[in-house]
Amino acid sequence: MKLPSVASLLIRVYRTTGPVSHIQRIRHGAVLNKNYSSVSAVKNCTALLYRNHGEPSQVVQLESLDLPQVGAECVLVKMLAAPINPSDLNMLQGTYAILPELPAVGGNEGVAQVMEVGDKVKTLKVGDWVIPKDAGIGTWRTAAVLKADDLVTLPKDIPVLSAATLGVNPCTAYRMLTDFEELKAGDTVIQNAANSGVGQAVIQIAAAKGIHTINVIRDRPDLRQLSDRLTAMGATHVITEETLRRPEMKELFKSCPRPKLALNGVGGKSATELLRHLQSGGSLVTYGGMAKQPVTVPVSALIFKDVRVRGFWVTQWKRDNRHDDEALRHMLDELCILIRAGKLSAPICTQVQLQDFRKALENAMKPYVSTKQVFVM
């Protein structure tokens, strides 16, 4: 069967004036003139589109897409900044748990500014900063027409890069520190992938609460520099995977109690080592698997220490709490308080233009990367 061309698909999609469907949201977007003086004069947008799965830098293309009319329950937003996260790369590769219908616009996170609102929109106004409530909207574009109910506001007095990177990693860190163990000041959390976006957020949020963190990173050429940077963020201890397996860990636990909570973003042997150091009744929470190896739980840890092994996916949490606006609002407000107080900062970011997407995607795929690639529009 012959598939319709993208051009004909766009023509059919943009004839609608009603609410934008889920598939329309993923595929298409909008753009504004640089002076933002006339929305009606704008006819198209620029977006990073992919039609099949594969090597991220090869399947993505920079394209111009038409601008749909703003429906009564929709808003026109200009994207300000949108990061490249590991989950975005997994979507491009076709290995993520949820995959949009193709063709799709890349990116699941970012901050935008509302430029026009539909007649029935009461929750948003022109000028508001907003981030997506859920994954799949497609944030790597200059602008979009989206349903107002799919967005949540952020205060405009926080840095743009903090806003752009708030919805995934800090939210993941916040929920894992809140939902699995009743942590109090003086308690300990141990984590691998400590230099990741989630890991950095864990360090800072825990430090703000007086919670010790033992932070495990891979050995690398810039080990001392990275260790110093994580320590400056509030890390109590920064150690390598090799140190985690050595007897001197006993000395470390003289300065802080054994952890109640272990956060695993790696899997494999690294996760097993985290389990080994948990106190009795503690929890191992897995949120990632960069090693692409299964989590192996020793029988002794289950029998003699009664450890709990759990998983966490922030996308599922947001979907489970889709109708609980207060829960999402409270979490975002708490994180913004930390940002304003200088206790939670965005990861080190490299700002890139959309047209430089190939280099940005290639850099995001490199090992030992300590900076996040962020598209700025």
Swiss-Prot record:
The active site is at Y96 (proton donor). Its main location: mitochondrion. Keywords: Fatty acid biosynthesis, Fatty acid metabolism, Lipid biosynthesis, Lipid metabolism, Mitochondrion, NADP, Oxidoreductase, Transit peptide. Residues 1-52 form a transit peptide. It catalyses: a 2,3-saturated acyl-[ACP] + NADP(+) = a (2E)-enoyl-[ACP] + NADPH + H(+). This is Enoyl-[acyl-carrier-protein] reductase, mitochondrial. NADP(+) binds at residues 169, 195-198, 218-220, 287-290, 312-314, 372. GO terms for cellular component: mitochondrion. Belongs to the zinc-containing alcohol dehydrogenase family. Quinone oxidoreductase subfamily. Pfam families: ADH_N (PF08240), ADH_zinc_N (PF00107). It comes from Danio rerio (Zebrafish). It is an enzyme of class 1 (oxidoreductase). InterPro entries: ADH-like_C (IPR013149), ADH-like_N (IPR013154), GroES-like_sf (IPR011032), Mito_Enoyl-ACP_Reductase (IPR051034), NAD(P)-bd_dom_sf (IPR036291), PKS_ER (IPR020843). Catalyzes the NADPH-dependent reduction of trans-2-enoyl thioesters in mitochondrial fatty acid synthesis (fatty acid synthesis type II). Fatty acid chain elongation in mitochondria uses acyl carrier protein (ACP) as an acyl group carrier, but the enzyme accepts both ACP and CoA thioesters as substrates in vitro. May provide the octanoyl chain used for lipoic acid biosynthesis, regulating protein lipoylation and mitochondrial respiratory activity. Involved in iron homeostasis; affecting Fe-S cluster assembly and ceramide metabolism. The keyword Glycoprotein does not apply. GO terms for biological process: fatty acid biosynthetic process; fatty acid metabolic process. Its EC number is 1.3.1.104. Coiled coil: none annotated. GO terms for molecular function: enoyl-[acyl-carrier-protein] reductase (NADPH) activity. The gene is mecr. Homodimer. The keyword Cell wall biogenesis/degradation does not apply. It comes from the Eukaryota. It is found in: Mitochondrion.
